[in-house]
């Protein structure tokens, strides 16, 4: 990341939602909880997101849109924003990765990369 850009840290927690899944019909539902930490000295705003979701068969789905969960949150300096969402896969294992497009107080846009993270039914992977 360019040192002139705000320092943004992304933390992800995932969970398999057994009660909404139906393995017999190849439907595996996962929730993810994301915390966006603004470690910079200025307020930033999340404008849009782009996800690349890949299942174990290599099927890829791109999800793009404004903000997250219907919001374009402003995150103050040294503050954080947490939200949860979910996705369904055709396989018990998959990977998500993506980007957030954000703007700083001067209206300059920058991209925050979201490193790949695993979605997996418990005990499927050793």
Swiss-Prot record:
Provide the protein name: Protein ApaG
Q: Where is the ApaG domain?
A: 2-126
What GO terms in the biological process aspect are recorded for it? error-free translesion synthesis
Q: Which Pfam families does the record cross-reference, listed alphabetically?
A: DUF525
**InterPro entries xref list:** ApaG_domain, ApaG_sf, Uncharacterised_ApaG
Instruction: Give the NCBIfam families listed for this entry.
Output: PRK05461.1
- Tell me where on the tree of life, at the top rank, the source sits: Bacteria
